[in-house]
Curated annotation (Swiss-Prot):
Gene: smurf2
Active-site residues, Swiss-Prot/TrEMBL: C733 (glycyl thioester intermediate)
Reaction(s) catalysed (UniProt annotation): S-ubiquitinyl-[E2 ubiquitin-conjugating enzyme]-L-cysteine + [acceptor protein]-L-lysine = [E2 ubiquitin-conjugating enzyme]-L-cysteine + N(6)-ubiquitinyl-[acceptor protein]-L-lysine
Name of this protein: E3 ubiquitin-protein ligase SMURF2
Pathway of action: Protein modification; protein ubiquitination
GO cellular component, one term: cytoplasm
Gene Ontology MF annotations: SMAD binding; ubiquitin protein ligase activity
Length: 765
């Protein structure tokens, strides 16, 4: 009896099989790693290593080890590059997975599981990517040999149409059917539309251990239950109604035609028999191109009307990110356009016959070969669909991540009282490549650890200091709008060029590390930062009166009206200074023939008036961190969003992307919190957001893209068990606010306001 007790409570024998890994990170430019896996039982010291597989990012080992696992033991499986492990301690690390005791029990006897590789610790700067496939078997389930497993099937992401792979909170993979709105554990093999009965309704939050309906009906509610049959019929009717396609679906293309899309998102139609292609939809007769659009009703959801540079109308499909000349309402409602009344049948037949493939000769005048569709807007081609800013930003982040060193940190320690000068001294003594390292900021005298929140607050406070017009580096562009521009009289500070260099570096660091500057410049400033020329239109947002005056000069005959020369004046600290727009411009009059040159030179001078050296210093600092060529895909408005984020706070977006911890939407704390937020003005909402996240700015994608210590992390309201005399606490690295269970709305409002306005500093719990 005693022996059996020892066996029951002592170490358990498990067989761990390390099958393969996939998509490992490539850290060398010219060669691939030699991966091997190392298995360590934390607690007992058992250690095993697999064979080394040469020159691959997708190694296959298929080796097993018998382990004795205690009640509190954990298993660490790490992947290493054999080529580098001898260089120094920790070299060659490619990722690891740590299985705690609860994870071991959950994964045991569940077959092969794909696990994401992670870093050794949260502060580790090594880049990690990929997955490893392992299985755990109990001793009584271990056979003489394991089944042959096709590793490629474990990583096959080509799911049938209508399916999506997701993970539960515990990490188990489930498959979502978008047609039947259901989920299942088994990997699907047929398109979603062929599944008539759902695995699990999406509206139900079913625990992953709850029995579900299997093909043979062995688990769950019996298949012949009349309630199930009734629900199934009703659900099928609902699906048929929701998936109906005959009302507003375009008719099939004529025989021999295919619809294709260029790499730029331009839709065209190819006639496979003749090899010619056209922008025009062959389903729509050409004589219907001038039909009254009001008769067709509104555009389908996600569509937009735009004009080319030559004024031709085209249509943008934001759902599929494509563009086309054909009105989508024409092809979708063709039967209504061609048959407006019973008497219109003959006209319909004639119109349809004119668009048949037999009349290709007539259409050939506007077609080109498939591989040579013209791209010049003057050729009336459909404009390219510009990828949305989020996608372009994602590409920029990927480019920047490749430049980040694998080791080391950019450490900055400053005091809150001297944040500007101390940051200036530390940042300016670093090399540009040091600024690419993982940013670690510490406020002197505070214990907070920087997992992103401290750096965000540092940039927030530093922005307010370095962009403050009080220091003379910048000035407001207009009295009524608080956008900034470079102060042409900044030379009163003899070190001003070095400070502009510093400002450029800080802006670059914010973009590189995924943070934001709390301030805004004029749009022409961002245009200059991109290296694009300034035009008269850029003047309108900066100086509307001057813009109107220059437009009047261009639009009217100034002969005998204006007595201007190519020389302008401006006031510098009470002194009138003259500036010649061209050599000897003081003696050159502005005439009807030279007014365009005068306006062009005036605009360039207005934006670069006395700031050429300052701007070049700032641009140099910015491009030291963010190379100029990486920004070619962006325009000035997009660059403004990248540098400054979204200043406008959308409360509805905030609410819908907030996580609740130890509370529900119906909890008083949650209701009172949002009531307080709605009562705040924009400035106070920004202060609240800065208090909780470290930044008053919202990411481009909205609140769903708030960043935490290790990737996106939603804004979180956490009701804690604490004295109601305490103030709310914020965890900026996790975007979480801890709120005690206050007795009333007024008390929550006062405590929250006090925390926002009267507190500062970081500590460690």
């Amino acid at each position: 009896m005693s022996n059996q007790g020892v066996r029951r409570n002592g170490p358990v024998k498990l067989r761990l099989t390390v099958l393969c890994a996939k998509n490992l990170v490539k850290k060398d430019f010219f060669r691939l790693p030699d991966p091997f896996a190392k298995v360590v039982v934390d607690g007992s010291g058992q250690c095993h290593s697999t064979d080394t597989v040469r020159n691959t990012l997708d190694p296959k080992w298929n080796q097993h080890y018998d382990l004795y696992i205690g009640k509190s033991d954990s298993i660490t499986i790490s992947v290493w590059n054999h080529k580098k492990i001898h260089k120094k301690q920790g070299a060659g690390f490619l990722g690891c997975v740590r299985l705690l005791s609860n994870s071991i029990n959950r994964l045991k006897d569940t077959g092969y599981q794909r696990l994401d590789l992670n870093k050794l610790g949260p502060n580790d700067s090594d880049t990690v990517r990929g997955q490893i496939v392992v299985s755990l078997q109990s001793r009584d389930r271990i056979g003489s040999g394991g089944p042959v497993v096709d590793c490629s099937r474990l990583f096959d992401n080509d799911l049938p149409d209508g399916w999506e792979e997701r993970r539960t909170a515990s990490g188990r993979i489930q498959y979502l059917n978008h047609i039947t709105r259901s989920t299942q554990w088994e990997r699907p093999t047929r398109p979603a539309s062929e599944y008539s009965s759902p695995g699990r309704p999406l509206s139900c939050l079913v625990d992953e251990n709850t029995p579900i309906m299997t093909p043979n009906g062995a688990a769950g509610v019996p298949a012949d239950d009349p309630r199930v049959q009734e629900r199934r019929v009703r659900s099928q009717r609902h699906r048929n109604y929701m998936s109906r396609t005959h009302l507003h679906t375009p008719p099939d293309l004529p025989e021999g035609y295919e619809q294709r899309t260029t790499q730029q998102g331009q839709v065209y139609f190819l006639h496979t028999q003749t090899g010619v292609s056209t922008w025009h939809d062959p389903r729509v007769p050409r004589d219907l191109s001038n039909v009254n659009c009001e008769e067709l009703g509104p555009l389908p959801p996600g569509w937009e009307i735009r004009n080319t540079a030559t004024g031709r109308v085209y249509f943008v499909d934001h759902n599929n990110r494509t563009t086309q000349f054909t009105d989508p309402r024409l092809s979708a409602n063709l039967h209504l356009v061609l048959n407006p009344s019973p008497n219109g049948s003959r006209a319909a037949v004639e119109a349809q016959s004119s668009s048949r493939p037999g009349q290709l000769k007539e259409q050939a005048q506007s077609v080109v070969s498939p591989g040579n569709l013209p791209e010049d807007p003057e050729c009336l081609t459909v404009p390219k669909y510009k990828r949305d800013l989020v996608q372009k930003l994602k590409i920029l982040r990927q480019e920047l991540s490749q430049q980040q060193p694998q080791a080391g940190h950019c450490r900055i320690e400053v005091s809150r009282e001297e944040i500007f000068e101390e940051s200036y001294r530390q940042v300016m003594k670093m090399r540009p490549k040091d600024l690419w390292k993982r940013l670690m900021v510490k406020f002197r005298g505070e214990e907070g650890l920087d997992y992103g929140g401290v750096a965000r607050e540092w940039l927030y406070l530093l922005s307010h200091e370095m962009l403050n017009p009080y220091y003379g580096l910048f000035q407001y562009s207009r009295d009524d709008i608080y956008t900034l521009q470079i102060n042409p009289d900044s030379a009163v500070n003899p070190e001003h060029l070095s400070y502009f260099h510093f400002v450029g570096r800080i802006m670059g660091m914010a973009v590189f590390h995924g943070h934001y500057i709390d301030g805004g410049f004029t749009l022409p400033f961002y245009k200059q930062l991109l290296g694009k020329p300034i035009t008269l239109d850029d003047m309108e947002s900066v100086d509307p009166d001057l813009h109107n005056s220059l437009v009047w000069i261009l639009d009217n005959d100034i002969t005998g009206v204006l007595d201007h020369t190519f020389c302008v004046e401006h006031n510098a600290y009470g002194e009138i200074i003259q500036h010649e727009l061209k050599p000897n411009g003081k003696s050159i009059p502005v005439t009807q023939d030279t007014k365009k040159e005068y306006v062009r030179l005036y605009v360039n001078w207005r934006f670069l008036r006395g700031i050429e050296a300052q701007f070049l210093a700032l641009q140099k600092g910015f491009n030291e961190v963010i190379p100029q060529h990486l920004l070619k895909a962006f325009d000035e408005k997009e660059l403004e969003l990248i540098v400054c984020g979204l200043g406008k706070i959308d409360i509805n977006d905030w609410k819908s992307n907030t996580r609740l911890k130890h509370c529900t939407p119906d909890s008083n704390i949650v209701k009172w919190f949002w009531r307080a937020v709605e009562s705040y003005d924009e400035e106070r909402r920004a202060r609240l957001l800065q208090f909780v996240t470290g930044s008053s700015r919202v990411p481009l994608q909205g609140f769903k893209a708030l960043q935490g210590a290790a990737g996106p992390r939603l804004f979180t309201i956490h009701q804690i068990d604490a004295s109601t005399n305490n103030l709310p606490k914020a965890h900026t690295c996790f975007n979480r606010i801890d709120i005690p269970p206050y007795e009333s709305y007024d008390k929550l409002y006062d405590k929250l306001l006090t925390a926002i306005e009267e507190t500062c500093g970081f500590a460690v719990e």
